[in-house]
């Protein structure tokens, strides 16, 4: 009887290796992730990218090569590859990290490129974002620069549910630049409490002792008339 834990562990390792291979080969295509699904007729591989055409290639040539690599190197049975576009790429941390790394390799100033990426992320509806660029930014000594806006969770239950984190590498003349992008997805925050406004109720004003005041005033008038007489 096969070991169930070992079986799923091996499948997870294969998926991680495929993900690392695709991230290394197709970071220019804004690679976002992969899903490996077992089907009765083989293995279905779904690749998400910001630029699917760069992975597909002319006439689907790259897909045929990928199918051979998945079958021979990673041991997938009859791989069926599907390449699809990413929904809301500005809210995908890996896509934005690769975009920022490509911008740095093209010669954009790191601070300007980071501000542009941050603006695109926040305009897409993110609750918060954090961008960290490390390397020999301005001097020969390596350092890092951080840009943060909005809400970014560092721990707790919200970290796994709402945070998307990715790391990319840019190869420049001064050396290797590291890029880290953290995005807080626009989901419902569990620890946020909104107080309901109480319905406005018209205030009732009650007037008392009106009759007593009138009687006392009449008595005082009669008394003053009697004194005059």
From Swiss-Prot:
Keywords: Ribonucleoprotein, Ribosomal protein, RNA-binding, rRNA-binding. CDD domains: KH-II_30S_S3_arch. One of its GO terms (biological process) is translation. It comes from the Archaea. One of its GO terms (cellular component) is cytosolic small ribosomal subunit. InterPro entries: KH_dom (IPR004087), KH_dom-like_a/b (IPR015946), KH_dom_type_2 (IPR004044), KH_sf_prok-type (IPR009019), Ribosomal_S3_C_sf (IPR036419), Ribosomal_uS3_arc (IPR027488), Ribosomal_uS3_C (IPR001351), Ribosomal_uS3_CS (IPR018280). One of its GO terms (molecular function) is structural constituent of ribosome. Residues 18-87 form the KH type-2 domain. SUPFAM superfamilies: Prokaryotic type KH domain (KH-domain type II), Ribosomal protein S3 C-terminal domain. Binds the lower part of the 30S subunit head. Belongs to the universal ribosomal protein uS3 family. This is Small ribosomal subunit protein uS3. It comes from Saccharolobus solfataricus (strain ATCC 35092 / DSM 1617 / JCM 11322 / P2) (Sulfolobus solfataricus).
């Amino acid at each position: 009887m096969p070991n169930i834990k070992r079986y799923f562990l091996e499948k997870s390792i294969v998926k991680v290796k495929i993900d690392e291979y695709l991230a290394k080969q197709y970071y220019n295509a804004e690679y976002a992730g992969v899903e490996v699904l077992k089907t009765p007729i083989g293995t279905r591989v779904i690749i998400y990218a910001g630029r699917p055409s760069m992975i597909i290639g002319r006439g689907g040539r790259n897909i045929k090569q990928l199918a051979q690599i998945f079958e021979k190197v990673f041991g997938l049975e009859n791989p069926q590859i599907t390449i699809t576009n990413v929904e809301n790429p500005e809210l995908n941390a890996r896509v934005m990290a690769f975009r920022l790394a490509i911008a740095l390799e093209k010669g954009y100033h790191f601070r300007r490129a980071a501000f542009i990426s941050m603006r695109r992320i926040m305009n897409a509806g993110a609750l918060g974002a954090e961008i960290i660029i490390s390397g020999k930014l301005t001097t020969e000594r390596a350092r890092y620069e951080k840009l943060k806006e909005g809400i970014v969770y560092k721990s707790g239950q919200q970290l796994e549910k709402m945070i998307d984190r990715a790391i990319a590498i840019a190869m420049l003349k001064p050396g290797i630049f590291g890029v880290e992008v953290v995005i807080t997805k626009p989901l419902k925050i569990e620890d946020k409490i909104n107080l309901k406004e109480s319905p406005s109720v018209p205030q009732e004003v009650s007037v008392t002792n009106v009759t007593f005041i009138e009687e006392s005033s009449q008595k005082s008038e009669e008394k003053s008339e009697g004194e005059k007489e």
